[in-house]
Design a protein with these regions (language model features):
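Alpha-helical transmembrane segments
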Residues: 61-70, 182-197, 275-287, 388-402
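Helix-loop-helix module between adjacent transmembrane segments
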Residues: 70-74, 104-120, 145-158, 186-194, ...
Length: 454
């Protein structure tokens, strides 16, 4: 076994296993999609047969919650209810175009909070561009922060996989962190971070009239026609009664989860051990029940659900999390004592550094749920307080750092002026500063609030 050989030459096997994990993540990102999950399985195989490490535990609770939430959100999308939400957002943006730099991120953040996934915001991006350009506002200003805000809203959503991950992992470690407690920390902190980043965005870049690159593009008649192309709007699209019914049922499902997690807990049955039922299975069956009611009352076709963008993105996330989180748990659980000894002194002196570790891991993993699935158990193993771990949750969004996430790429494509861009040096892109400001401020505020809430 490689572990024995490495110990004989004075190198702890953890470092080789960590290198293998980073290599798996690198190639998983290069291939994209479900590749990260598949390669995670390959990594576990290599750890088992080359290093003699027993496989860790796959995050079954997290995976089941994601499946339940994503399926119900996909059912909502299949009824056209997402277009109803986008329609309401567009009305607000067009009514106050001069405030688009604030209203755009508020709309994308709220949309993500409502449906639990940032992939629901794509129909809103061309609307934001149209409103900004029509008002003479540099589109980069509202569009970049709108994309960032759409992902910041994930940990502030009661039906997101990331929030469910926090509750599930805390329960696994016998720590009672409820859905309302998480929301009390993440909602205000992420909103404050988003608004600070939006304020910075108000004056970013040159006005279009003073931007030489933009003015040069406008000299080309074909480019001018492309930039000033027809406006995009969903206001003229009909809204069906099915969409209204589906949205009502979905919202009632969210309210039910929040109520059962707080004031209505006595209504829940006891488990086989006579203990109060945790919120992990409750989130699963309530969301599936909401999806079933939408199915019955709207008559939406099951095939339309499985063909939806939300379902596709969610199932990719499930495979990613199963493979890479399982491999990460294998590395961590197989070397827990060594890792704890290595990091405990520093983390005890400066607990906030754990948030930096979460941020760094997220930049590569590109999933808040997957990042929290890997890092929170390590935080508990290091003896960090629940308040510190909960305060670190907003730091799980760092995949704006390398600008290759679908929502960021879509934002760049929808900005026909070219002001929202990936820079020459890759890291100097439009999302870097608003992302760092938004996540940084949100994490600091969350750390402060968590000390009171938990």
């Amino acid at each position: 076994m490689l572990s024995t050989l490495m110990q004989q030459i004075g190198i702890h096997p953890f470092w080789a296993q960590l290198l293998l994990l980073l290599v798996i993540i690198y190639f998983g990102i290069r291939f994209g999609g479900v590749a990260l999950g598949l390669l995670g399985g390959l990594g576990i195989t290599l750890l088992a047969f080359l290093f003699g490490v027993a496989p860790g535990k796959p995050p079954i609770d997290v995976i089941l919650i994601i499946i339940a939430v994503v399926t119900t959100s996909a059912t909502l999308e299949a009824t056209g209810a997402l277009n109803l939400i986008v329609r309401l957002a567009e009305k607000l943006l067009r009514r106050h175009p001069e405030r688009v730099t604030y209203l755009a991120p508020i709309c994308t953040f709220s949309l993500t909070m409502l449906v639990g996934t940032g992939h629901a915001v794509y129909p809103l991006l061309p609307v934001i561009y149209d409103v900004a350009y029509s008002k003479g506002i540099r589109p980069e200003r509202p569009m970049a922060i709108a994309s960032v805000a759409s992902q910041m809203g994930i940990t502030a959503s009661p039906v997101s996989a990331a929030l469910a991950t926090v509750v599930a992992i805390a329960a696994t470690h016998h720590v009672a962190i409820s859905v309302p407690q998480v929301l009390c920390v993440t909602v205000p902190s992420c909103i404050i971070g988003m608004l600070v980043a939006a304020t910075w965005s108000l004056k970013r870049g040159k006005d279009l009239a003073d931007d030489p690159d933009f003015q040069a593009r406008m000299q080309d008649p074909r480019m001018r026609e492309y930039i000033e192309g027809g406006s995009h709007s969903v206001l003229g699209e009909a809204v069906s009664s099915q969409a209204r019914s589906a949205l009502t049922i979905f919202l009632l499902g969210i309210v039910a989860i929040v109520c059962l997690a707080s004031v209505a807990q006595p209504l829940l049955p006891l488990d086989a051990k006579g203990q109060p039922l945790t919120m992990v299975p409750v989130i699963q069956f309530v969301m599936l029940a909401a999806g079933a009611l939408i199915l019955f009352f709207t008559g939406v076709k099951p095939k339309a659900i499985s063909d939806s963008k939300v379902f596709n993105a969610g199932m990719i996330a499930v495979v990613m999390i199963m493979g890479i989180a399982w491999m990460s748990d294998t590395v961590i659980s197989g070397n827990k004592g060594y890792i704890t000894d290595l990091l405990k002194a520093e983390v005890e002196r400066h607990p906030w550094t754990f948030a930096l570790a979460i941020f760094a891991f997220s930049a590569f993993l590109k999933s808040q749920a997957a990042t929290l699935t890997v890092m929170l158990p390590l935080g508990f193993a290091l003896g960090l307080s629940p308040a510190t771990l909960l305060g670190s949750v907003p730091a799980s969004y760092a995949y704006f750092f390398f600008c290759f996430y679908p929502s960021d790429l879509a934002t760049i494509n929808f900005d026909r002026t070219g002001t929202t861009h990936i820079g020459k040096y890759i890291l100097n892109h439009s999302f870097m500063v608003p992302g760092l400001i938004g996540v940084g401020v949100a994490t600091v505020v969350a750390m402060l609030i968590a000390q009171v809430v938990v």
